[in-house]
Amino acid sequence: MTTIKTSNLGFPRLGRKREWKKAIENYWAHKIDKAELDQTLTDLHKENLLLQKNYHLDSIPVGDFSLYDHILDTSLLFNIIPERFQGREVNDDLLFDIARGNKEHVASALIKWFNTNYHYIVPEWDNVEPKVEKNTLLERFKYAQSINVNAHPVIVGPITFVKLSKGGHQSFEEKVETLLPLYKEVLQSLVDAGAEYIQIDEPILVTDDSESYEDITRKAYDYFANEGLGKYLVIQTYFERVHLKFLSSLPVGGLGLDLVHDNGYNLKQIEDGDFDQSKALYAGIIDGRNVWAADIEAKKQLIETLQQHTQQLVIQPSSSLLHVPVSLDDETLDESIAEGLSFATEKLDELDALRRLFNDNDLSKYEHYKARYERFQSQSFKNLEYDFESVPTHRKSPFAKRKQLQNQRLNLPDLPTTTIGSFPQTREVRKFRADWKNNRITDAEYQEFLQNEIARWIKIQEDIGLDVLVHGEFERNDMVEFFGEKLQGFLVTKFGWVQSYGSRAVKPPVIYGDVKWTAPLTVKETVYAQSLTDKPVKGMLTGPVTILNWSFERVDVPRKVVQDQIALAIDEEVLALEEAGIKVIQVDEPALREGLPLRSEYHEQYLEDAVHSFKLATSSVHDETQIHTHMCYSQFGQIIHAIHDLDADVISIETSRSHGDLIQDFEDINYDLGIGLGVYDIHSPRIPTEEEITTAINRSLQQIDRSLFWVNPDCGLKTRKENEVKDALTVLVNAVKKKRQESESTTA
């Protein structure tokens, strides 16, 4: 058999303990200057490269490291600058302003990266002049060479980049053709600098409509081949299957395929002879998106199968390791569960174990991982019985009747205002929580602090004039991790951070066993907040679909079973809140859209399961109890009917970063439930104007019945500063008051 090689597609940017995040946020807060930021990030990039080198990879990616987002990096590389930000020097400060907005201009749209919890900044083509502005990819490649790292450059391919863009008068094909000479310039510079191959990521080729743009895809890669570059290119795909016969016909040196999340189709196509054996096969055999250790014996057998179909085999993760934490080294976990886990560095070590086995006949690492996996699998985490049938999955009455009863009970004004749930997690809040978790303060001291913060923010909300209040979620570090800490069947790590967007990091819990509610989770804080005001306070919960999508899910039982187990746990908490007198309960599902499979053949079942789980969690309450939900960052056209089927009394949806595009989705559906379309972007420090909020309200009311419409920010306010929150909410409430006055004067 031929020698196998190992490679990687991308590595986590955050650092073991979020050094990347802290440096960038310190720069934004003017606590460090640009020179210190650059040095910190250079050191971290070097650490990442050398860490990967320790695992004997034949080639290490460079270009995956970023100050914010690799798609935004590509936009700046080719001078695809939003019109409102043009005329400035292309530098890191411009990058941050495009991503976050500033006092003068709104940020660019933020969209989920395929069906992951990562988000990219959408490129904007309106009135742009594409050119190679600053070849940072070449700089990073040369840096890797300078520290003796055998690296391959990584760049998002032209088909994917343009397909993920918006705006401009050119057609999709015209935009691709515009970029081809610029890609050629960058690719040639990398080859001239010594790149043995270039990883060109085209994940868009795994989607349903990829066959509709095969002609322009072929034209693009024929162009590169005619320029003498084809043999240096490896087209990487991930997250799903591809049309392998077409992909194999492209004049490139290699193809990267996901052999984990392809439902077996990529392997079948290889076995059917659709892979061009003159090319290198970059086989994604180690799961790049989940944290479970590989069944290394099964991977050995897979490699043996693949070797029958290629003479150039490179094994790698199924996708960039951006989606998993850095390392288990700093964790102190129950060994019986830790043996079943694998973070980024452990995944690279699994690749090294397989490389040693096949190339050197060295069984030591292989046997180690095989024994660990077998010990973990010998345990049983399926111990509980569930009565799914006894819990209702439909509300007692139709929405019209519920709305009448809720109006009588809540007595809310026209265009009611609220927020999405969380308020600023200040340094003081985080310190008190950390001190409590580390037993540096007593339970009583921590509860006193929480109650003081809740009381302070209840008063702030009342002073501003909001109609439905929230307690602020100061006891929660994350909307999923919090529930993972309290529900049976979850494991929460200390340093298992992954990047969500920009400097925002989340720590997904690990679901390892049966999920069960054992005690109230949120009742104490919510009831205390309600005791301070006559206005309704929302109970704040995270929904079953989001908890599952934002956790590392177990793989030993079907996904639907885990989702419904979580739904039953949330149902218990919903009933506990209702019994405690809470009149409005929000069950957030911001991740419902992101979990939608990339292939439409799987959509119907996914959405059916998601709707069922949400209704399982929310249908036991009385008609008078108002159920809210919230979704964000998404393109909802494909799921608008499922959103309606949730039968939530009120749904709030992020629209600000889409600049109103979402409202068009309501033109084709008679949406007859309560709805709030977020009227300003909380991900930017910029304070909206009354005029902007009024414009957003007016546009929304063109499509939505006024009696159903709510006014709110687009997401929780956890990441904002206190003064930003107060100022923005004051503007929001003032704009609504003027709208109410207009209505009163019109009807007078």
From Swiss-Prot:
Tree of life domain: Bacteria
Keyword Metal-binding: yes
Listed cofactors: Zn(2+)
Cofactor remark from the record: Binds 1 zinc ion per subunit.
Residues noted as binding 5-methyltetrahydropteroyltri-L-glutamate in the record, renumbered to the chain: R18, E19, W20, K21, K112, W550, E594
Residues the entry annotates as binding L-homocysteine: I420, G421, S422, E473, D588
Residues that, per the record, bind Zn(2+): H630, C632, E654, C715
Family matches, as Gene3D superfamilies: 3.20.20.210
Pathway connected to this protein: Amino-acid biosynthesis; L-methionine biosynthesis via de novo pathway; L-methionine from L-homocysteine (MetE route): step 1/1
Recorded GO MF terms: 5-methyltetrahydropteroyltriglutamate-homocysteine S-methyltransferase activity; zinc ion binding
Signal sequence interval, chain numbering: none
Keywords of this entry: Amino-acid biosynthesis, Metal-binding, Methionine biosynthesis, Methyltransferase, Repeat, Transferase, Zinc
GO BP, one annotated term: methylation
Residues annotated as the enzyme's active site: H683
Top-level class of the enzyme under EC nomenclature: transferase
Function: Catalyzes the transfer of a methyl group from 5-methyltetrahydrofolate to homocysteine resulting in methionine formation.
NCBIfam families xrefs: met_syn_B12ind, PRK05222.1
Name used for this protein in its record: 5-methyltetrahydropteroyltriglutamate--homocysteine methyltransferase
Organism whose genome encodes this protein: Staphylococcus epidermidis (strain ATCC 12228 / FDA PCI 1200)
High-level lineage: Bacteria, Bacillati, Bacillota, Bacilli, Bacillales
Gene: metE
